[in-house]
């Protein structure tokens, strides 16, 4: 940044599933200038503003036990602009009460209640309705592969890539089901791996 300049706003712009631009609004500043700024997320023309302390001051919720995970009905995957902005904790407080973060290093979010049609979630990421949740092991991989022969597959914070998980499931790409292999934190316990089958909700 230029000497003597202070950041007043950061614009993170995403379109068509890609982060296109990162724009800084700079103004002249003295040595004692306040460093607070506004973080503006633009996802396909939908705009949401955060202050510079939003992420630091947000405390995400995590699951206490497996029963809590199994009670979830919705999964949210942040869009490219939110991810580029690094707003991984602020998601829980800004996009819907009751959102639970999968794990400290897994940026997927769950809710027991699916959002209404005008929810910000649908504009700032992908919303999925959960149809199946099981612990990830050899038996569940085989069962999921047989149950959902056509599905998109994503691995998040587990010991295999998306392609490796797809090969183990033996599924073909396509259909309306998305299978996530997810590392999930449960309180103070060690993270464990789960399979979640979900169907994406269409944007209104």
What does each model-identified segment do?
Residues 1-204:
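SAM-dependent transferase fold signal centered on methyltransferase-like domains
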């Amino acid at each position: 940044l230029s000497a003597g300049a202070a950041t007043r706003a950061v614009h993170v712009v995403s379109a068509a599933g890609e982060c296109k631009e990162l724009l800084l609004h700079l103004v002249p500043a003295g040595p004692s200038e306040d460093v607070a700024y506004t973080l503006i997320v633009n996802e396909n023309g939908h705009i949401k503003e955060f202050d510079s302390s939003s992420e630091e001051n947000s405390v995400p919720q995590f699951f206490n036990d497996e029963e809590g995970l199994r009670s979830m009905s919705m999964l949210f995957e942040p869009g490219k602009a939110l991810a580029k902005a690094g707003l991984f904790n602020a998601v829980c407080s800004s996009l819907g009460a009751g959102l639970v973060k999968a794990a400290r290093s897994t940026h997927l979010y769950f809710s027991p209640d699916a959002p209404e049609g005008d929810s910000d979630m649908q504009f700032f990421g992908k919303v999925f309705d959960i149809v199946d949740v099981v612990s990830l092991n050899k038996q569940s991989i085989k069962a999921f592969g047989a149950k959902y022969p056509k599905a998109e597959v994503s691995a998040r914070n587990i010991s295999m890539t998306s392609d490796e998980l797809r090969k183990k499931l033996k599924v073909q790409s396509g259909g309306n089901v998305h299978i996530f292999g997810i590392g999930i934190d449960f309180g103070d316990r060690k993270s464990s791996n789960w399979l979640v089958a979900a169907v994406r909700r269409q944007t209104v």
